[in-house]
Amino acid sequence: MPKLGMQSIRRRQLIDATLEAINEVGMHDATIAQIARRAGVSTGIISHYFRDKNGLLEATMRDITSQLRDAVLNRLHALPQGSAELRLQAIVGGNFDETQVSSAAMKAWLAFWASSMHQPMLYRLQQVSSRRLLSNLVSEFRRELPRQQAQEAGYGLAALIDGLWLRAALSGKALDKPLAHSLTRHFITQHLPTD
């Protein structure tokens, strides 16, 4: 009989092991055997919890996207009466949270983005994440701008966030957070009306 609470512990171990494997060898070369070995479990445990490698990869993607959602929401909840500018900066901060810019997370995101073009479930997850970012940004810009301008500003800031993140991921270096925050803050202030 399985121990109570073991399922969540095992799932976490396997997701963490998957991120480590992707970080070291890439998604396509990360095998079930390697992941199981890193997690200290048998390959049968992966089949038990996730069916197969695709199920494990999907769970890993869901985990990363939920960490992103939580990073953004935690910052927004801390600013319930905050200005649009502060709340936009909070959304940016969530996207540049350590859970999203660690080497393992960046490599996993790149692998998932590439795979999402060919795997419908990963595509849906990627689309949900992209739409959520754009919706959050437009909603905050909408507090200060007409609809069309808010949509354009939201799209531009989303592109800037993704571009800064992608340049860092492809450089193999850590994201320069002060620079990223400075550039996004400048974009935000350029697009919001001045009093």
UniProtKB/Swiss-Prot annotation:
Concerning InterPro entries, the annotation shows: BetI_C, DNA-bd_HTH_TetR-type_CS, Homeodomain-like_sf, HTH-type_TetR-like_transc_reg, HTH_TetR, Tet_transcr_reg_TetR-rel_C_sf, Tscrpt_rep_BetI
| Task performed by this protein | Repressor involved in the biosynthesis of the osmoprotectant glycine betaine. It represses transcription of the choline transporter BetT and the genes of BetAB involved in the synthesis of glycine betaine.
Please list the residue ranges the record marks as binding DNA: 31-50
> Pathway, according to UniProt?
Amine and polyamine biosynthesis; betaine biosynthesis via choline pathway [regulation]
What does the record list as GO biological process? glycine betaine biosynthetic process from choline; negative regulation of DNA-templated transcription
What protein is this chain from? HTH-type transcriptional regulator BetI
Upper taxonomic classification of the species? Bacteria, Pseudomonadati, Pseudomonadota, Gammaproteobacteria, Enterobacterales
Give GO terms: molecular function aspect only.
DNA-binding transcription factor activity; transcription cis-regulatory region binding
User: Domain HTH tetR-type spans what residues?
Assistant: 8-68
Disulfide-bonded cysteines: none
Gene name tied to this protein? betI
PANTHER family registered for this protein in UniProt: HTH-TYPE TRANSCRIPTIONAL REGULATOR BETI, HTH-TYPE TRANSCRIPTIONAL REGULATOR RUTR
Keywords of this protein's UniProt record, alphabetized?
Answer: DNA-binding, Repressor, Transcription, Transcription regulation
